[in-house]
């Protein structure tokens, strides 16, 4: 009997030891796991954080049917207006002027790459993308431009792409079925010339310019280097032109409007992030 009692006591003690030991091991495992999580915590630079802020904008531009619908709406409206205009006599040939980026060609893959790599725009990385000649047309652009071309309308592309990128851009456009009526119909950024207004006036010298297309207010008038207040005033003066002579498209990814948030100052990533938050309009609880 005593032997059985001793055996029972030993068995119970051993069980308690094993349970306690397992609990301690589990506790140590949890502690080690938490320490591992702490050790693998990722820290982002200000430039990476700034780049990441563009994620939802790029996703909307690439994935949202609403984005495509806005392009279709703009180009269908332009087609109807052009049909009406073609029935009217003109001394000079009709012409239209279009920006290229996010107006005719979709460059959102370049923006996406910057997000994934935690980088931002540089002339060098942008040129790599342009030289690949892989940008696709935005919804409705090809059909509208082919219609305009077939009806004798002069098509000019006024872009702030570098003059050295004309050949690659022409190849990209032609590959996607976008009409290019000659090298002289691509008016790109020349050294020392920032505003697009002079290039628009050049088109007006020999043609009857009837419509302008773009994703940025500088594609329609001289909105460059203006404060938010000045841009608002100029917009109110031109508001009757939108949906008529001016066709504007959505671009939440970048644009000249952003400089208004920074008051025209050239800020580093850290200060840009701060100014963005300060510019938000919220409400009191």
Segments predicted by a language model, with ranges:
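Sec-exported extracytoplasmic/periplasmic mature domains
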Residues: 83, 87, 110, 146-154, ...
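Surface-exposed patches in mature extracellular/periplasmic domains of secreted proteins
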Residues: 86-95, 155-160, 185
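Soluble non-cytosolic domains of exported or imported proteins
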Residues: 50, 65-72, 76, 92, ...
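Non-catalytic pre-domain segments flanking phosphatase-related domains
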Residues: 2-3, 9, 19-98, 263-285
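C-terminal cap/substrate-recognition subdomain and adjoining C-terminal extension
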Residues: 26-29, 44, 162, 166-285
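Short, acidic loop-to-helix structural element flanking the phosphoryl-transfer center
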Residues: 128-155, 163
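Active-site neighborhood of HAD-like aspartate-dependent phosphohydrolases
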Residues: 88, 93, 104-135, 150
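Ser/Thr-glycine-rich phosphate-binding loops at phosphate-binding pockets of nucleotides
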Residues: 103, 158-160, 215
């Amino acid at each position: 009997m005593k032997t059985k009692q001793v055996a029972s006591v030993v068995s119970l003690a051993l069980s308690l030891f094993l349970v306690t030991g397992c609990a301690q091991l589990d506790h140590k495992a949890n502690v080690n796991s938490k320490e591992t999580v702490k050790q693998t915590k990722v820290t982002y630079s200000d430039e990476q954080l700034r780049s990441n802020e563009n994620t939802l904008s790029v996703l909307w531009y690439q994935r949202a049917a609403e984005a495509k619908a806005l392009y279709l709406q703009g180009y269908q409206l332009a087609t109807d207006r052009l049909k009406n205009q073609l029935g009217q006599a003109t001394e000079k040939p009709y012409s239209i002027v279009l920006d290229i980026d996010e107006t005719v060609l979709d460059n959102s893959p370049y923006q996406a790459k910057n997000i994934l790599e935690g980088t931002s725009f540089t002339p060098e990385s942008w040129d790599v993308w342009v030289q690949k000649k892989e940008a696709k047309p935005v919804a409705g652009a090809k059909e509208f431009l082919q219609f305009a071309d077939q009806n004798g309308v002069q098509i000019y592309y006024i872009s702030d792409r570098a003059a050295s990128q004309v050949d690659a851009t022409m190849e990209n456009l032609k590959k996607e079925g976008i009409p290019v009526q000659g090298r002289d119909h691509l008016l790109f950024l020349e050294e020392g010339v920032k505003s697009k207004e002079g290039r628009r006036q050049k088109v007006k010298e020999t043609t009857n310019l009837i419509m302008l297309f773009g994703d940025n207010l500088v594609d329609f008038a001289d909105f460059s280097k203006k404060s938010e207040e000045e841009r608002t005033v100029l917009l109110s003066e031109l508001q009757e032109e939108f949906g008529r002579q001016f066709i504007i498209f959505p671009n939440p990814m970048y644009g000249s409007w952003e400089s208004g948030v920074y008051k025209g100052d050239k800020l580093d990533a850290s200060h840009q992030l701060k100014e963005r938050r300060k510019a938000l309009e919220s409400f009191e609880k």
